[in-house]
Amino acid sequence: ELVRELVERAVTEKTGGVEIRTLARDDFFLHLCAHLYKEATTYPWIRMKRDMTLYKYIDLYMLLYETTTSAADEIAARAHALGLGTECYFAVSEAVNLFGDESGAGTRILRGLPDVDTNGLFSVISPEEKKEYRYTERDTVRRFFCADREKLLEEVGVWKP
């Protein structure tokens, strides 16, 4: 259902003299957020050291840098409408913590998502083990530069899908 809606809202963009179909800007942004969130909060990705890939944070940062106030409001509203508030909040706050927020768009998006449980942003799930973990280190920069992020996790309970 969600994928169908995203595809139906797709737009045609011109780049390098070529027209391509792509997701609407706010949907594209949220798609990036959802992927980053999934990888950063799923234990196997942490084990493979693919949970905090720099290029994904840079992509978000560059999009935030170019985002207007009205577009930031649209992203927050769309995230809320699609049930992607947590994913969006996580990805935006992490990108802002790593690179800053010169345009103010990141802060604007975060303010537009007041219902997100920020304590839950540090949870990690292990679907195969049916366990839930939580980061003991909440500082994004420290986590990013930690050579073994598995050591920053503590088991907190059973994960139920």
Q: Could you say what each language-model-derived stretch is?
A:
Residues 1-161:
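Conserved NTP-donor binding/palm subdomain of two-metal-ion nucleotidyltransferases/polymerases, i.e.
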